[in-house]
Amino acid sequence: MTDLEIAQKAQMLPIKEVAKKLNISEDDLDPYGKYKAKLPLHLINAEKMKNSKLVLVTAITPTPAGEGKTTVSIGLTEGLNKIGKKAIAVLREPSLGPVFGIKGGAAGGGYSQVVPMEDINLHFTGDFSAIEKANNLLSAVIDNNIQSKTHSIGIDPRTVVWKRVMDMNDRALRHIVVGLGGSTHGIPREDGFNITPASEIMAILCLSENFSDLKRRIGNIYVGKKFDGTPVFARDLNVVGAMALLLKEAIKPNLVQTLENNPAILHGGPFASIAQGTNTVLATKMGLSLGDYVVTEAGFGADLGAEKFLNIKCVSAGLAPDAVVVVATIRALRHHGGAKKEEYNTPDLQKVKLGIANLEKHIENVQHFGLKAVVAINYFPHDSEEEIAYVKEICAKKGVEAVVSKGFSEGGKGTEELARAVVTIAESGESHFAPLYSHEASIEDKITTVATKIYGASKVNYSSKALSQLKQINKLGFDKLPVCIVKTPKSLSDDEKKLARPTDFEVTVREFEFASGAGFVIPILGDTVRMPGLPSVPAAEGMDIDDEGIISGLS
C-alpha cells in the first residue's frame, strides 16, 4: 500500500482521547475538527521540563528524495512508547511547496506516519496561511507608506529588503517589479517572493517564547532605510499589533496523533537549507512539559538543520539534547560512493565503502557539540546484510552504535531496538551540550567556525557584495547575532556536485541577508535561492480528488 492508503485506513482516536494520554483536559483543547486541536501556551511547565529527555533526529547528506528523518522520528516515538516511555513526536508542519513539488507528502512514511495525513499536508490548521498574511501585511504597509503624501516616513524604495512570501514553489516570482500601472497603483520598485518557510515571520514564530516576545521580535524586523540613511524597522510603521493578531492562533502548537495513536505535536516549518530548519520553541517546550521523551527533527543533514538547531534554537531557548539520532540509508551511502540514480537500489558494498565518509563526518559533527549519538540505518528491502554489517562496523570504530530501523514497514515494533539504544544514551548523562561558537565572536569568525568544523572547508571567501553588506550589518549592531547559513543540502560543501566527504575545498559567501527580528544573520553560500522552483514533472501532476472527496496521489 502507498503511504496515503495506509493513512486512509488508520484507526484514529478522537483528539480528546489522545489529549488524555498527556493529562490534557478537554477544556484546554481547541479542536479543529475531530482529529486536530490547538494547545494553549499555559501547558508549558518549566519544572516538568527538567525531568524530560530531548532527542534530536538528524541525518547524513541526503539524496533528493530524503532519507527518512520524519519517518524515523515518528517510528522512534512509537518504539519508545512500546518500551514503556511516554514519548511525543514534536515535528515541523509540511510546506505546500515540496508537497506539490519533488517530495510529495511530508508526514512520515509507511507505518510511521502522523495523521490525519491529508489534512496535515494540505493547509492543516492554517498556520502557514497566517504567517503568509502577517508577512504580506507588512509588505502592503511598506508600499502604502512609500506612496502616501501625508503619512510617509520617507522610506527609500531602493533600499527595501522585505519580500513578499507564498507557500508554493514558483521560480517566476523570485524577481518582480511592483507598483506598475500609474501613480494610483503605487511606486514602481523591484521586489520578489520567498517561500513561506523562509519568511522571517516563520523564523520569529519558531523562536518566540510567548506573545510579548513575538511582538518584540516583529518590531525588530529591518525593512530598509529612509532617504536620510536611517534604518526603518517594522515598529516604525505601527503595524506590529496587526501582524501579531494575525498570528493569534498560529502561535499555539497543534496536537495530532501517530498511526499507533501516540501524541504528536506539529508546529512551524522553516526549511533547513534556507532557514533554521526546526519546529517552534513553544512546541518543543510543551512536549517536554507533557511527556518523558520528546523526539524532534532538524531538516536535511547535520551540517544544516542540526547545526542551526544547536547553535540558534538551543542557545536562544536554553535547551540541550540528551541524545542525537543520525539517520543513514544504505541507498544514500551508495549515492555518496558514486552510484548513479538508477543504481541506488542495487547492493554494492564497494560504493558503500566509498560513501561511508559522509556518515563519519556527520557523526563527528554531532560530537563537536559534546553530544552522544546513535546511528539509525533506515532500512530498505534492497539493503544487503554485508552492507549493513559494514556500516555497523565503521560506526563501532567511531564509538557509536548503529541500529537498523524498520519503522516504515513495521511501525513501533520495528524500532524497539533503536528506542532502547536511544534511552541508554539519553539516560547515561554523557551528553554535555556546548554551542560551537560564542555569539560575541565576529560574524566572520562564526562563519569560519561552522565552515571549517562542520562542513570541513579549508577557507571562507567573500564576494565584494558580501563584504559591503557585512559592513552594514556591523554598523547596524547585528554582529553579535548567530549565523544561519544558507547552503545546498546536497553536499557538505557549497557545491552540490561534491559528494561523500570533500576535502581541500573553499566556500564563498555570495551575499548576506539578516533577520534582526528573528535574531540571526544569513550568509548565503553558492547559488542557493529562497524561493524554490518546481521540477519538470511536479508531484502535483499525480494528485486528484474524486466525487466522494477521496484524495489520491498524495504520498
Q: Where is each model-derived feature located?
A:
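Flexible phosphate-sensing "switch/lid" loops adjacent to ATP/NTP-binding sites
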Residues: M1-S555
